[in-house]
């Protein structure tokens, strides 16, 4: 049983690459043809690459590894949050804060601050503080939650990164590479595939395409987790 069908990929517009003038020659091996000034991605290769990425995600999750989903462009934000949450994993879907991986201790301090303010809100501290101070704390909480909410329960570095558009997320990719954290990525015709360990050649600009592929990666994690439940049961 294949993980994904050509029909699903076609319907989601996964085959549409970027304009021919905006391409990375290293993506040539994944390009099928050119049509009306746009590169068309070879979906037979995408099917194979999705299957490889699926197996990789499943294996990492089966070993108890955590995967960090990263996608801050508008077309990816919702899918990244929804699918990472569904799979019980972590995500960054707003802005990648420099040092999220390479300076994780500092990020953990910000996360501690986020949790401290949350606790104050829950335990009634807000009720006894001056109104002005509460307004400031709520603003701070909102900002911290926006940028760190998806990783606030991440205790250590992830075992892998799943990235939508490595060109847009180049800081995240560079940090992961520096720390030898494997990267699985949705890579369009304008990206450098050499930066990514497990390339999924696909349209990274269509919401449906991003949602479809991200959901398959979440499915892989859930399959591994269901396997664990069966074993423990």
Curated annotation (Swiss-Prot):
Keywords for this protein: Ribonucleoprotein, Ribosomal protein
GO molecular function: structural constituent of ribosome
Pfam family, one: Ribosomal_S2
InterPro entries attached to this UniProt entry: Ribosomal_uS2, Ribosomal_uS2_bac/mit/plastid, Ribosomal_uS2_CS, Ribosomal_uS2_flav_dom_sf
Source organism, top-level taxon: Bacteria
Claim: Hydrolase is one of the keywords in the record: no
Ribosomal protein among keywords: yes
Similarity remark: Belongs to the universal ribosomal protein uS2 family.
Record's protein name: Small ribosomal subunit protein uS2
Source organism of this protein record: Bacillus cereus (strain ATCC 14579 / DSM 31 / CCUG 7414 / JCM 2152 / NBRC 15305 / NCIMB 9373 / NCTC 2599 / NRRL B-3711)
């Amino acid at each position: 049983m294949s993980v994904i069908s050509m029909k699903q990929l076609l319907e989601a517009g996964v085959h549409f690459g970027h304009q021919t003038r905006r391409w990375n020659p290293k993506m040539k091996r994944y390009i099928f043809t050119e049509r009306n000034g746009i590169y068309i991605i070879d979906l037979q290769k995408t099917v194979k690459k999705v299957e490889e990425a699926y197996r990789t995600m499943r294996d990492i999750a089966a070993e108890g590894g955590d995967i960090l989903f990263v996608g801050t462009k508008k077309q990816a934000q919702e899918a990244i949050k929804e699918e990472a949450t569904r799979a019980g994993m972590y995500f960054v879907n707003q802005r990648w804060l420099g040092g999220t991986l390479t300076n994780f201790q500092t990020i953990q301090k910000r996360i501690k601050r986020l949790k401290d303010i949350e606790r104050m809100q829950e335990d009634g501290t807000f009720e006894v503080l001056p109104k002005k101070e509460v307004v400031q704390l709520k603003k701070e909480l909102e900002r911290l939650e926006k940028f760190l909410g998806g990783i606030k329960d991440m205790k250590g570095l992830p075992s892998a990164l799943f990235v939508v558009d490595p060109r847009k997320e180049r800081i995240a990719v560079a940090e992961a590479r520096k720390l030898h954290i494997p990267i699985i990525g949705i890579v369009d015709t304008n990206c450098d595939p050499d930066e990514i360990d497990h390339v999924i050649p696909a349209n990274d600009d269509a919401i449906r395409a991003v949602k479809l592929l991200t959901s398959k990666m979440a499915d892989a994690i859930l399959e591994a987790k269901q396997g664990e439940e069966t074993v423990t049961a």
